[in-house]
Amino acid sequence: MESLKRFLCSIALLLISLLLPSSLAQQQQHESIRTMEDFSGYPIHEPGQFGSINLASSLSVDAPGLQNQIDELSSFSDAPSPSVTRVLYTDKDVSARRYVKNLMALAGLTVREDAVGNIFGKWDGLEPNLPAVATGSHIDAIPYSGKYDGVVGVLGAIEAINVLKRSGFKPKRSLEIILFTSEEPTRFGISCLGSRLLAGSKELAEALKTTVVDGQNVSFIEAARSAGYAEDKDDDLSSVFLKKGSYFAFLELHIEQGPILEDEGLDIGVVTAIAAPASLKVEFEGNGGHAGAVLMPYRNDAGLAAAELALAVEKHVLESESIDTVGTVGILELHPGAINSIPSKSHLEIDTRDIDEARRNTVIKKIQESANTIAKKRKVKLSEFKIVNQDPPALSDKLVIKKMAEAATELNLSHKMMISRAYHDSLFMARISPMGMIFIPCYKGYSHKPEEYSSPEDMANGVKVLSLTLAKLSLD
């Protein structure tokens, strides 16, 4: 029995002697890391501690909390639920902005606003002098739309920062969230107003200062001041402009607004390009008159001219023989708008887009030719044919695409490369920064309508990809 005890003691001593050097070495390594951290002022992470694979496994999204925030934000609306109407500089818009700024502050971000109400929330990195990595979207909503368009990219960005903070990640480059002013053209007829100004549009800044008014003849400056912005006494908006290279990269998380991801059962869309959009305003003037007293041969009907042009838009788009060419008559208004009065004036607003800029411009040219032909044929006056904007397409940056695709793969999420056919603030951010977009599925591709919906799971997947991509880019 004694011999057995001596044998077991010998084995125990041998095991202790083998394990002790490894334990001491690990302790010495930890002490060395702490010493280097104290000396440098920066965290020195152990190998793999914040490697992207390990970080991917530690990302935890508060999906119910994000959904609750989206629901709460949707209550700031001038339309009854489930519709959302949130127009630039209205009381509901101001309240919604206040709500988002509070969420940014709760996330520990430094919050600031510029002269037109672009809102910025920054998480300072370990090297704050480096250009930051930015992300964001918009929260304004066209009349009677849904609660996810743009909002997922703002509230999802705040949650992405919270996700990274909960994981223990420390960014090298600062991370900044941008809430863009007026991505929708609802009030002043200008899409992506805030991001256009950030990209340095002098023409827009001058127009906003001097000529731009809304449907009630309220000037942009008056409206901005009513919401607490544009306080410069000279109405100078150039302070909004950002220099090229202000950001290392810009990312936008967004619902797809189309059915492809849902139809194909995919989690993530990695956007490679944004289609080239253009918008037109057209007006015809006729002689009007009584609907019963003026016989058909004597009419110069501005309403029928508008109707004929609307059909011509469809015809010219289809003539391109490309699935990527689209055209929409989104507004058609008749004056005086009475059932027993022949329209004396008509107003159309036309949207046309394509991934091929030259092909889109050909469609615009044909629409203008048709407008002139219709005016002559119907003996009405083409009083306005105005190209409001005619923007080029934007390509996503190759490095940003690579990082987004890597993030999706490391998170075991299915993804595909795809084109964005809708307007986004990213189109203009691409003029000052490398850009990329992350799409998530939405129910039946619905958007700009109350049925717009993205599931908490799909939003959480998007937030994870955004978080991991931000982390990757912040360490570059």
Curated annotation (Swiss-Prot):
Co-factor note (free text): Binds 2 manganese ions per subunit. Can also use nickel and cobalt with lower activity.
Q: Principal localization?
A: endoplasmic reticulum
Q: Name one GO biological process term.
A: purine nucleobase catabolic process
What's one GO-annotated cellular component? Answer: plastid
Q: Give the binding site residues for Mn(2+) 1.
A: H138, D149, H254
* GO molecular function terms noted in the UniProt entry: hydrolase activity, acting on carbon-nitrogen (but not peptide) bonds, in linear amidines; manganese ion binding; ureidoglycolate hydrolase activity
What, per the annotation, is the impact of changing H290Q?
Answer: Strongly reduced substrate affinity and enzyme activity
Q: Where does this protein act, in terms of pathway? A: Nitrogen metabolism; (S)-allantoin degradation; glyoxylate from (S)-ureidoglycolate: step 1/1
Instruction: Tell me the first and last residues of the signal peptide.
Output: 1-25
Phenotype upon knockout is:
No visible phenotype under normal growth conditions, but mutant plants show a slight reduction of growth on a medium containing allantoin as the sole nitrogen source and accumulate ureidoglycolate.
The observed outcome of changing H448A is: Impaired enzyme activity
- Entry keywords, A to Z: Endoplasmic reticulum, Hydrolase, Manganese, Metal-binding, Purine metabolism, Signal
Enzyme class, broadest EC rank: hydrolase
Q: Which Pfam families match?
A: Peptidase_M20
Mutagenesis or variant effect for H424N: Reduced substrate affinity and enzyme activity
Subcellular localization: Endoplasmic reticulum
Q: Does the keyword Hydrolase apply?
A: yes
Q: Where is this site: Necessary for dimerization?
A: R299
Mutagenesis / variant outcome for changing N340A: Strongly reduced substrate affinity and abolished enzyme activity
Q: Which family does it belong to?
A: Belongs to the peptidase M20 family.
Biological role: Involved in the catabolism of purine nucleotides. Can use (S)-ureidoglycolate as substrate, but not (R)-ureidoglycolate or allantoate. The sequential activity of AAH, UGLYAH and UAH allows a complete purine breakdown without the intermediate generation of urea.
Q: How does it assemble?
A: Homodimer.
Q: What is this protein called?
A: Ureidoglycolate hydrolase
